[in-house]
């Protein structure tokens, strides 16, 4: 499992994207 800030940011963005929808 990769635990990097970039991965976390990407996940956050994906969640925001779904929320924005």
Curated annotation (Swiss-Prot):
Biased composition (Acidic residues): 1-11
Pyrrolidone carboxylic acid carried by residues: 1
Predominant location: secreted
Region annotated Disordered, chain positions: 1-21
Ranges in a coiled coil: none
Keyword Coiled coil: yes
PTM remark: Conversion of fibrinogen to fibrin is triggered by thrombin, which cleaves fibrinopeptides A and B from alpha and beta chains, and thus exposes the N-terminal polymerization sites responsible for the formation of the soft clot.
Glycosylated residues (UniProt): 4
Domain of life: Eukaryota
Keyword set includes Coiled coil: yes
Positions of modified residues (Sulfotyrosine): 6
GO biological process, one term: blood coagulation
Location in or out of the cell: Secreted
Free-text note regarding domains: A long coiled coil structure formed by 3 polypeptide chains connects the central nodule to the C-terminal domains (distal nodules). The long C-terminal ends of the alpha chains fold back, contributing a fourth strand to the coiled coil structure.
Physiological role: Cleaved by the protease thrombin to yield monomers which, together with fibrinogen alpha (FGA) and fibrinogen gamma (FGG), polymerize to form an insoluble fibrin matrix. Fibrin has a major function in hemostasis as one of the primary components of blood clots. In addition, functions during the early stages of wound repair to stabilize the lesion and guide cell migration during re-epithelialization. Was originally thought to be essential for platelet aggregation, based on in vitro studies using anticoagulated blood.
Binding partners and assembly: Heterohexamer; disulfide linked. Contains 2 sets of 3 non-identical chains (alpha, beta and gamma). The 2 heterotrimers are in head to head conformation with the N-termini in a small central domain.
Protein name: Fibrinogen beta chain
Annotated organism of origin: Muntiacus muntjak (Barking deer)
